[in-house]
Amino acid sequence: EVDPIRHTLHISEESFSWMEEILDAWSEDGKPIFAVSHYLFENTAPLSFDSEIIINSNTIGEQDQQLRELLADYENVFYFCGHLHASFGVIEPYQVVVEDGGSFWEINLSSLKASARGYLPVPSTWLLYVYEDEMVLRARDFASGKWLTQFDQVLELSVN
C-alpha cells in the first residue's frame, strides 16, 4: 500500500526493457549517461537512513534494487533526483554501489522553490560542467548571483 503522503516510483517491465535498450546504445561511446527521476534510492541520503522517522517511502520503493542493478551495469551513469527539498550542506553526490561491483552516482538536486534543510536561499542549485575525465558541479545561488564554492563537487569519469 502506498503512503498517501509520501509516494514511491513505479516502472513497468516494458519501461525497464526500453531503459536497458537505451543504456546499451548510449553507453557505447563512454560518455556520461544522465538519468533523471523525482525519487532517490533507499539509504543514499541522510533523510532516508539518519532520521527518527523512517521515510524509505520517500524513495524509489519496491523496485529500488532492480533499478540499482540496471544503472550499475553501465559506466559513467549519473542519476539526478530530488524530492527531499534538501539543499547544499545536507546531501552530497552519493556513489551507489551494488553487490556485483557496479556503481553509479546519485545526485540529489536542491529544490528551486523552497528548501527545508541546508542552504536555504532559493533558487540555488548546481550547474553541470562535463569534461573528458570529470564532471564538475558548481553551486550557485541564483537570487544573489553568487557562486557557492564551498559546495562545489568534482566527480571522476571512467575513461576507456
Task: Locate each region found by the language model.
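Short amphipathic alpha-helical segments and helix-helix/interface helices
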Residues: L23, D64-L71, Y94-V97, T125
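Active-site environment of divalent metal-dependent phosphoester hydrolases
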Residues: V2-I5, Y39-P46, N76-Y94, A114-A116, ...
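Short, isolated positions within intrinsically disordered regulatory regions of eukaryotic proteins
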Residues: E20-I22, G30, V130, F151
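Solvent-exposed, well-ordered amphipathic alpha-helical segments
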Residues: E20-S27, G101-S103
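Binuclear metal-dependent phosphoesterase catalytic core
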Residues: A86-N160
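Short beta-strand segments
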Residues: F34-H38, F80-G82, I107-N108, A139
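Active-site-proximal segments of metal-dependent phosphoesterases and phosphodiesterases across multiple
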Residues: D3-S17, W26-F78
